[in-house]
Amino acid sequence: MAKIAKTHEDIEAQIREIQGKKAALDEAQGVGLDSTGYYDQEIYGGSDSRFAGYVTSIAATELEDDDDDYSSSTSLLGQKKPGYHAPVALLNDIPQSTEQYDPFAEHRPPKIADREDEYKKHRRTMIISPERLDPFADGGKTPDPKMNARTYMDVMREQHLTKEEREIRQQLAEKAKAGELKVVNGAAASQPPSKRKRRWDQTADQTPGATPKKLSSWDQAETPGHTPSLRWDETPGRAKGSETPGATPGSKIWDPTPSHTPAGAATPGRGDTPGHATPGHGGATSSARKNRWDETPKTERDTPGHGSGWAETPRTDRGGDSIGETPTPGASKRKSRWDETPASQMGGSTPVLTPGKTPIGTPAMNMATPTPGHIMSMTPEQLQAWRWEREIDERNRPLSDEELDAMFPEGYKVLPPPAGYVPIRTPARKLTATPTPLGGMTGFHMQTEDRTMKSVNDQPSGNLPFLKPDDIQYFDKLLVDVDESTLSPEEQKERKIMKLLLKIKNGTPPMRKAALRQITDKAREFGAGPLFNQILPLLMSPTLEDQERHLLVKVIDRILYKLDDLVRPYVHKILVVIEPLLIDEDYYARVEGREIISNLAKAAGLATMISTMRPDIDNMDEYVRNTTARAFAVVASALGIPSLLPFLKAVCKSKKSWQARHTGIKIVQQIAILMGCAILPHLRSLVEIIEHGLVDEQQKVRTISALAIAALAEAATPYGIESFDSVLKPLWKGIRQHRGKGLAAFLKAIGYLIPLMDAEYANYYTREVMLILIREFQSPDEEMKKIVLKVVKQCCGTDGVEANYIKTEILPPFFKHFWQHRMALDRRNYRQLVDTTVELANKVGAAEIISRIVDDLKDEAEQYRKMVMETIEKIMGNLGAADIDHKLEEQLIDGILYAFQEQTTEDSVMLNGFGTVVNALGKRVKPYLPQICGTVLWRLNNKSAKVRQQAADLISRTAVVMKTCQEEKLMGHLGVVLYEYLGEEYPEVLGSILGALKAIVNVIGMHKMTPPIKDLLPRLTPILKNRHEKVQENCIDLVGRIADRGAEYVSAREWMRICFELLELLKAHKKAIRRATVNTFGYIAKAIGPHDVLATLLNNLKVQERQNRVCTTVAIAIVAETCSPFTVLPALMNEYRVPELNVQNGVLKSLSFLFEYIGEMGKDYIYAVTPLLEDALMDRDLVHRQTASAVVQHMSLGVYGFGCEDSLNHLLNYVWPNVFETSPHVIQAVMGALEGLRVAIGPCRMLQYCLQGLFHPARKVRDVYWKIYNSIYIGSQDALIAHYPRIYNDDKNTYIRYELDYIL
């Protein structure tokens, strides 16, 4: 009970408490005085709103939203008929897709841009620079100054300017941060703002046309009022003017959102807009920037002027310039995207708009006079609305004087408007509509459906592939049908290249192949400029896919060979696009990038490559420096390290910029990574170039120098310690002085150098460096941990380090700081820790390490248990279980059983670990086998498929150990259990069960197997129909093993049934399955005789599928090899009589494989098959001749030295006429046959055939004969000497070599 209040204060407090409790009551439980009443909502379905049940909004379309009409309601008032559907619980179980779900998303080829991180996205900000001057063109003549080509000097100046600007901005930012920036009221601020002039106010000398002569960029920089920001607006490192053709010059990717900027308004922090410094505005100061939200709102139909009043004469453009300004060529017009129609098209342009540009809704309707192209692209509703509006405008237009005179009686006159009168022009009164007649009809208009949109052509005409929406901006010219004969040669060339590129990018393989060959052959005719100007922007496309990039890179690779030195002016352009490939995560992309840069270096030469890439070496942007360093490494590998050494020496010792030194040293590091042991001849020179970097004043330079030393030492392993003598001292000092990243790099270098040293030195250095390593064990930095682990591994792996030292000094802190849960979460740390621990175990023994981590097999974190298991598996795989005592053995078995049972993820780590440990322990496992088998049997009954699969897999891993422990009874029991589980419905589990049965059959033998083989095999026959690869592979292996070792346990009828099932397995995608299948045919034929099996196989030659026929021919050859060829050849040769192409080719293919397999046994059958081969070598069908040539090749190689030369010479006469075939497959087979015949009948006879055509008048004949002669020469050079024709001496020359005739 509450305490009774006695004093006045207590009473007041109690009252306040009661009032507070009342206020806290839920207001929903009561009814307010002025509120509506509430019904029982369970019965009547009440609502808080008085408007419930009313339609609160009208749909935009005139169709009512019917969803509400069928919503189920349980109220008595206004009860609707309930709909019938599935129970709510069932519906909730079905995952509902979101509105934006794309069912095809996972099947679409991924775009490169989707997988790029922030750093790699940098490549899209790079600008494809304009062509540069080729100093070697025209024999090195002085270039014509009128060409305006950018020279090396221009690029370096721009680089210098960019760098200065960056530094100034940095200083300003620092001053602003420190509060030292002051507003200076100078002379410029006191000048009155320039008055805006209308164009009517201009005097004669201010005519816009009288633009003074264009100044050079350096003169402009000194002109008052002109801020030299022309080049500072660029992305660092890439010069201006390199924009994609058609892009607005001067608009950069980092520019602010375009907005309406009146004249004189400066972009903050940028000075005047580049290119807009017009004469007459020199001393004007910039007015405050105008906010677009402060302006008078305008619709699209307003006067498209320049921020001026309503009464101005409309102008054609919408730039932000004042009317008085002269638009400087090349200057960017700052436009507002809000006051433009989506596709502003000039009236005279071709009336086809690319998709995505169609004006929709208001913009299209608000156009004053749409051009024919715009009319074409309007929707029918827009066109109808526009026609009505035009008719109303036509009726409400101002009346002309003639019309007024006709309407009014005489006596009226027109009064002049009062002075200063400005007519009111509101957006609603569309008085600025241009009265351009379009020949339309007024009056009643029949509303017919407008089909113009349906015929808009968004695909190129002619035999061109499908154009994706993303490609339209690059290939839009192909959408316009033009008469190509009317175009200029340059335009024709451009269209031709565009067509070829579209075929390569989007075409079918045959189309792509032809286009690639054509663009390669005509590369010099097209020229480097037109080709690269179209290919490179495509490669920069943000929607590019891997396959498309691969194809375009292949185009560049091919045309580089053809263009050769013509490529020099475009080297930088190509590098900007290709360099990002060097840091791509895809290995093949990196290889392609290296290949292109390598070919480019060979085509352009060292001087061009250095002069092109030199400005990028000290670029302010780290991304550019990184990619440039990698590219230089590729150039070094292509042109040789010695040619680049003088340049590298100069760069690495640059005093002007630390960026240059940093990049130079990085180039050395990348050369070492790329070229590996190929740096050994130049190792001392490379070390000398970068050694001073270890004591540089810049931290980043010191770090990269240490990393470069580490890379060089890694590449040179195990040689070259003498070359590193000069850097040992600074490295040693460095590891004592540095902390953080710098220390990590120095430790890495020491770590790679210690394995190169002699044993006594390695021991001394390891002891010294270990003090620092042990200190850094507790570092929280992930990168430092990885390096410390790596260095510990390297130090402990050297010969001079003793096991006792490692046990006492290293192991305690190592396990304390590294064997933690957090290390198992990061994959790179996980891998490094396992490797280092295994290396320590190699020194100190398995028991020492395993005893420290065995208890962690029962840890609660699965990832940590996996790390422990993997470490134990590797240690025991390397060192065995000899030094593991009985107690540790028990702990180990107990731990791995626990870890195996507790695993939740499907991973092979636990399985591999279990198998390795059990196999390493061998007979010592016998006491634990009942426990292991009990666990396995119990888990085979588990409802989870993954658990059952792991249990079956474990049986296959431990079967060998069970045999070693003589537990055949246990294995027989397991075999019966597995046999009962052959009805398993999950294919992954069934595959594992078959694998376990196979393992048991292998070790227990056929006669002891339970269940018996005669029961097991019929159970396997239907499983062969299963299409799952794992099931197929394990099942065919098991059947093959039984056919090989226990065929007598099964009836011939069952084997024939299996033969028919095996034919289906020949269609399998996996080669291992097909190989096992054809081998099984051989085993079965050996068991039941070849005739029935052969009949089955010969029938299979009639099928259409090529893969099936080829596998069948291989099976026939294997049957022939197994059961002797005479059992197969009669039937095979008889089958050749069937007048069907596939069958005849199959027979020839079988003969080819047959003679390949039987080798020298072929000597007995060569005369039998010669008539068949004669017929095949004279057949009209190319494939017959090709396959018959292959038969001749294998046959002649098999019978070499067995006296069959007469038959082979006969066949040579049939093979020889085919040497002039053009099909690459046929000519390859024919050349193979000739090679085989060279071996079998000797090079002399081949030379005699060859000599007749070596000097033939026709070049095509000579080419073929010389090709054959070259192959004979390569194969039997010495044997030919005795057989060259004797050429007698003439008056001038002595051809006979008499010494060859000497006979002793």
Curated annotation (Swiss-Prot):
CC terms in the record's Gene Ontology section: B-WICH complex; catalytic step 2 spliceosome; nuclear speck; nucleolus; nucleoplasm; nucleus; spliceosomal complex; U11/U12 snRNP
In-chain residues carrying the UniProt-annotated modification N6-acetyllysine: K141, K214, K554, K562
Region of interest: Disordered: 100-119, 124-148, 173-360
Effect of T273A: No effect on interaction with PPP1R8
Region named Interaction with PHF5A: 547-550, 1156-1157
Effect seen on changing T303A: No effect on interaction with PPP1R8
Extent of the HEAT repeats: 529-568, 569-603, 604-641, 643-677, 680-718, 763-801, 843-881, 1010-1048, 1052-1090, 1122-1160, 1163-1201
Phenotype upon changing W200A: Abolishes interaction with RBM39
UniProt-listed GO biological process terms: chromatin remodeling; mRNA splicing, via spliceosome; positive regulation of transcription by RNA polymerase I; positive regulation of transcription by RNA polymerase II; positive regulation of transcription by RNA polymerase III; RNA splicing; RNA splicing, via transesterification reactions; spliceosomal complex assembly
Cross-link (Glycyl lysine isopeptide (Lys-Gly) (interchain with G-Cter in SUMO2)): K214, K413, K430
Region (Interaction with SF3B3 and SF3B5): 1248-1304
Stored Gene3D superfamilies: Leucine-rich Repeat Variant (1.25.10.10)
Positions bearing Phosphothreonine: 125, 142, 203, 207, 211, 223, 227, 235, 244, 248, 257, 261, 267, 273, 278, 296, 299, 303, 313, 326, 328, 341, 350, 354, 426, 434, 436
Residues under site feature: Interaction with PHF5A: E592
Positions of region (Interaction with PPP1R8): 223-491
Feature type site, description Interaction with SF3B3: K602, C677, E1205
GO molecular function, one term: splicing factor binding
Protein name: Splicing factor 3B subunit 1
UniProt source species: Homo sapiens
